[in-house]
């Protein structure tokens, strides 16, 4: 992305540091990434951008807003942020849909290059204001024949919903029944 290089830090520098410092296994099989809301988007983006680092991605109530903010105009805002924030975070909003800031672009790239796609777990509340975007992304995954664990349930964009799903996605990541 643009702006500060958080994806590089989270996707490359931090995992390498942790593996070396704590003498952990160097393969990606036991390296996961997860997040909630904008962090859910970040987990998908970083997990796909650094697919060689992560084997699994967990994304709860993800802010999959790339299509919403594309073509946004200066001095405008939505429920989350304003044009300036999005421009700093994603770069040229006229080009964001076709950029590596779009998880759909990253998935298509991994597929076309024959690379392994990390396993994906998603959950979103049925009353969450980002439900439509999460459903659309799941539809994209289905159309691309990319398997993902997708869960919906009663709840909004809050910790009450996420707390109910944290244990589920941790068990999924660790493959515990």
Predicted regions located by residue number:
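Non-catalytic cap/lid and distal C-terminal segments of serine-dependent acyl enzymes
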Residues: 1-177
């Amino acid at each position: 992305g643009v702006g500060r290089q958080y994806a590089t830090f989270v996707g490359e520098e931090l995992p390498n540091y942790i593996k070396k410092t704590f003498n952990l296994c160097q393969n990606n099989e036991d390296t996961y990434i997860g997040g909630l809301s904008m962090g859910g988007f970040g987990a998908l983006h970083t997990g796909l951008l650094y697919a060689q680092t992560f084997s699994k991605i967990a994304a709860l109530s993800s802010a999959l807003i790339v299509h919403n903010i594309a073509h946004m105009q200066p001095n405008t805002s939505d429920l989350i942020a304003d044009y300036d924030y999005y421009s700093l975070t994603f770069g040229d909003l006229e080009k964001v849909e076709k950029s590596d800031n779009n998880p759909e672009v990253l998935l298509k790239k991994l597929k076309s290059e024959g690379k392994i796609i990390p396993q994906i777990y998603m959950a979103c509340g049925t009353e969450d204001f980002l439900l439509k975007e999460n459903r659309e992304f799941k539809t994209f995954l289905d159309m691309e024949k990319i398997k993902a664990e997708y869960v919906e349930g009663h709840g909004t964009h809050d910790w009450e919903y996420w707390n109910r799903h944290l244990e589920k996605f941790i068990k999924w990541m660790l493959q515990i029944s």
